[in-house]
């Protein structure tokens, strides 16, 4: 990362050409640049139409400029914005003009957000929420990211940390006055009450995290079954485009095919697996092995078949739904959708899940004609809503959050051990405070910062 005393700039809007493009500038020379290229500084936070000229006074564009004096800006530094016409040549001319000034350079990925973090405009959990919002593909992911960006976890962690500091101060005061009667005991008692309540609150948050971390990556649905029963046709139907090769020859699919979908506002990854059967072909055997492995890891398995749906289903820890395909070949029998079909006993590893859709749901469809697909998709959406029910409102959205909160809870628990010396109680509380400080990005997180901010786009 370049020194933060340099002034940076970058395109902050989307791909060119476009109707409008916005170039953001942040740093100590932002005001100088704006004055040099437009003739004067506009009033703070006021859009002004300007003629933008380079250092030779050649006209670059007729645009709009805004000025935000630090620290009352997005980054906490002086910030200028150039709103120009979104042509590539216009942007190139403005970039050349900005680059001609000393101490001014293009920004690196995430550098604007990192400067905002370093200047106290947002904590690390809020920066992660911004990253999640930028990468959100579904409505549920967007809602979760907005809550994180709004300080859902950060505000709580700051309050917890303040309580730990207050309790530590009481305990250390008791240590200082240990030789004066029962002062230490009088100070220790309320501190331990605070610690116990705080531990219970963090433990409750950890217990309620549900599947919030999975909401960022999505639920996995595996389509499995024997060869040539229409698995590839089904995934093409669900994706509404051709993602898998469809052939009347059995064994066409040899590897796992994945497609990311938005079903009911939830992120769902659907995988098409090789047909599961006995084979002497080593390539097909590997495909079957991978199919069984992915089905075993899935959150929901659609076991596709035709006819009477006899035979073995895959062993999985998730629900397995029987989906009878090709009902269009049975002379129009049935309208498709959920049916009360007898389901063959599944492998011992299968389990029934709570909620409306368990491990014994069954459907009739025609993947080719689309018959019954509406009911199947609606059922998957309902399953996803139940699957992610607790994840949208949970505080924790990343493994990093969970790990640090677990560390803090463990240290608080140790500090509550009976007859633990006050000095050791204070040390455990100090370590718990450090864990929460790392959660907020205030303590020893340089490596984490580099990884997080590198995921942002250049203009963010």
Swiss-Prot record:
Residue numbers binding (6S)-5-formyl-5,6,7,8-tetrahydrofolate: 24, 81, 121, 460
Annotated Gene3D superfamilies: P-loop containing nucleotide triphosphate hydrolases, Probable tRNA modification gtpase trme, domain 1, tRNA modification GTPase MnmE domain 2
Residue span(s) of domain TrmE-type G: 218-385
Keywords on record: Cytoplasm, GTP-binding, Hydrolase, Magnesium, Metal-binding, Nucleotide-binding, Potassium, tRNA processing
Pfam assignment, any one: MnmE_helical
Binding site for Mg(2+): 232, 253
Cofactor: binding details: Binds 1 potassium ion per subunit.
Entry EC no(s): 3.6.-.-
Molecular function GO labels: ATP hydrolysis activity; GTP binding; GTPase activity; metal ion binding
EC class of the enzyme, as a word: hydrolase
InterPro entries: AAA+_ATPase, G_TrmE, GTP-bd, GTP-bd_TrmE_N, GTPase_MnmE, MnmE_dom2, MnmE_helical, P-loop_NTPase
Lineage top rank: taxon: Bacteria
Subunit structure, interactors included: Homodimer. Heterotetramer of two MnmE and two MnmG subunits.
Functional summary from the UniProt entry: Exhibits a very high intrinsic GTPase hydrolysis rate. Involved in the addition of a carboxymethylaminomethyl (cmnm) group at the wobble position (U34) of certain tRNAs, forming tRNA-cmnm(5)s(2)U34.
Annotated protein name in UniProt: tRNA modification GTPase MnmE
Naturally occurring in which organism (per UniProt): Rhodopseudomonas palustris (strain BisB5)
